[in-house]
Curated annotation (Swiss-Prot):
Its main location: secreted. The keyword Disulfide bond applies. One of its GO terms (cellular component) is extracellular region. One of its GO terms (molecular function) is toxin activity. Contains 2 disulfide bonds that can be either 'C1-C3, C2-C4' or 'C1-C4, C2-C3', since these disulfide connectivities have been observed for conotoxins with cysteine framework V (for examples, see AC P0DQQ7 and AC P81755). Keywords: Amidation, Disulfide bond, Secreted, Toxin. Belongs to the conotoxin T superfamily. This is Conotoxin tx5f. It comes from Conus textile (Cloth-of-gold cone).
Length: 9
């Protein structure tokens, strides 16, 4: 998705 942000998916 948009590392390091995992929950953005």
């Amino acid at each position: 998705c948009c590392p390091p942000v995992i929950w953005c998916c």
